[in-house]
Amino acid sequence: MSNEPKSKRGGSSENRGGGNVWLVLLAVTGAVVLSAFLFSDNRRRLAYPHLKELLAMSAERQEMLEAQRSASESGDAAANVDGESRPESSVISRSSSALISGDPANDIPVPKIVVPSSTKEDVWHEFSRLDNIFVADDRITGKVHFKSFVKNHPSEKEPAEEVTFLTIRGYPNDLIAAELEDLLVQSGVKWDNDRPSRFLENHWPELLMIGVLVALGIVMLKRMGGVGSPMSFSRSRGKLYSEDDLPTTFEDVAGIEEAVDEVREVVDFLKNSEKYQSLGGRIPKGVLLVGPPGTGKTLLAKAIAGEAGVPFFSLSGSDFVEMFVGVGAARVRDMFTQAVNRAPCIIFIDELDALGKSRSGSVVGGHDEREQTLNALLVEMDGFDSNSGVIVVAATNRPETLDPALLRPGRFDRHVLVDRPDVAGREEILAVHVKNVKLDETVELKGIASITSGFVGADLANLVNEAALLAARNGKPAVAMEEFNEAVERVTAGLEKKNRVMNEDEKIRVAYHESGHALVAAALPNTDPVHKVSIIPRGLAALGYMMQRPESERFLMTKSELESQMKVMLAGTLAEEMIFQDISTGAQNDLERCTETARSMVMDYGMSRLGRINLRRNTRSPFLAGSGGGEYQIMHSDEMAKMIDKEVSRIVDDMLVHTREILEQRRDVLEAVTQRLLEVEAIDSDELMRLIQENSRGPWLVPGTVTEKPKAKIVPREETESQQSNRS
């Protein structure tokens, strides 16, 4: 088979888990560091009395500066008036001039105050000049020059540093406020009651932390498969494949020729749309592929896009419906918008039943997200231009659950059945799957196809793979017919349970049980031939099995064939009863299937004494066995139910009588087959027939049966017309 195409949206996600863990650790570490920085107060605490003392010292220093300046100005004026008559004053003036020529403030002692540190022992802070004080109602802040030193080593001081100080005022009264204001005025320090906004300066760490966390969150969403924009929930999740990514063609699709022929017109329209538009024709807007699981519906849709050479949007019906209201409808609209922009193209919706379920069960006046999404799909399919080159291909295996409005002409105009393949179809599918498998000369694909009745394409692909694995496990250079037969048994009956060892009594009982099935199946002419009998445990509960191989495809069953099947089902438990005068629980599945067959004959097929009537309606899915809770709708009264139970019991009892007669007449063959089973544990059809011929004393077929089934006499049309003319 061809390799699966690669999506353009696909990406490597092998290391996403580890990357997300490192991102989370990085985010937590950054948050801890920033939080520690934010909650740590690096402002120096300065008590209110110490602040007043510093302000008072600053006021004294300011007065000394003003006095010195006044003295300097007076000395300069006297020197200009009479510089030679006063020699002593000239000395003072020269010193004053020298003082002024420099920086007078440097010669004034700077007021200082030493206080112990509030955080470290034996450490003292030497506060000096204040600057830029802001006075608030509850606190005073500003800048202060300080040096730190150890108490026992006052000479070893740290370099001068300018930091922000904080003084808590408590609840000041008017006198204290007035006293502080006078000190501020006298100190000459710049101060204000209205500080300008410093939001960024004070809160930049918080803003930085928020920005880092938001950036990390966006990166983590992208790496975890999320999306970057807040509006991305409404974007379609369909995967876009270009024509180069779709190597699948109709040659890769085998066994469903009728379905391929139905969709060839779609490919021709995408290639030559002008031919249809010029004649006024309209291509179907939608193609619905219906069939059991594994029959190749998705593969057929890929082949359509690969043959047409157009873009291919692939998505599932569950990709639309989300927990957020309105998201599904928005995704539907976005999907069709993208498709129209890339027309001609194909939109493939797999599992359409997840989106298009019938609205008949909805609550009147209620709101359902799935119903809203379905309404959007109905509008888009019937709203966009039919000549736009956008074709919707959908697949489902539950068409009975779809809304009727979705199936009407104008939306899904064409319904294509992709059914289980027949013998010829299975042979073609096997030929496709074994292209890259080394086969032995003994392999016959036709023989494999004949023993795989009911298999779909996915089952056959798994069968070929199992056979190849078995050959590799056994060390063979090529896959032989033996591996294919073993693979069929593994798929149908399950894996061998070699560790499930039965005791000798159970093994003998199982051997008689399976021999009874095989003998009755071989004694009745209207049953499928026996392929293999085994007492090797397989699967979950099977301690042994008898495998039959149909000679041809069957679509109808007669009453005699159903009765023969019931006899084969009952033969196992009757063989146990005949040999051991006791029965076991191993016949549970046989009795269950036999009873259901008898009930179907009475209630569904009209094959009983109650008449040819139908007493129940089948509500099961035609493609999914066992789907749904109630599989049947009862259509009879309680009195009729009693009659049905009696008729079912009568039919089963009659089958028991006939089956017991068959086994009693062939007890010698039963013993021989059982003995051989205990020796080799498995016998094939050839060995079974040899044992029957060697140990059979009379005619093998059951008396009263015929080997050839009756056939209707076909009267030629000319003979019929001549008879009618003679009568007239």
UniProtKB/Swiss-Prot annotation:
Keyword Secreted: no
Free-text function comment from the UniProt entry: Acts as a processive, ATP-dependent zinc metallopeptidase for both cytoplasmic and membrane proteins. Plays a role in the quality control of integral membrane proteins.
Subunit structure comment from the entry: Homohexamer.
One Pfam family in the UniProt entry: AAA
Feature: compositional bias, Low complexity: 88-99
Membrane topology: Multi-pass membrane protein
Active-site residues per Swiss-Prot or TrEMBL entry: E514
InterPro entries in the cross-refs: AAA+_ATPase, AAA_lid_3, ATPase_AAA_core, ATPase_AAA_CS, FtsH, P-loop_NTPase, Peptidase_M41, Peptidase_M41-like
Name the record gives this protein: ATP-dependent zinc metalloprotease FtsH 2
Cytoplasmic side, ranges: 1-18, 220-728
Biased composition (Basic and acidic residues): 709-720
Species name: Rhodopirellula baltica (strain DSM 10527 / NCIMB 13988 / SH1)
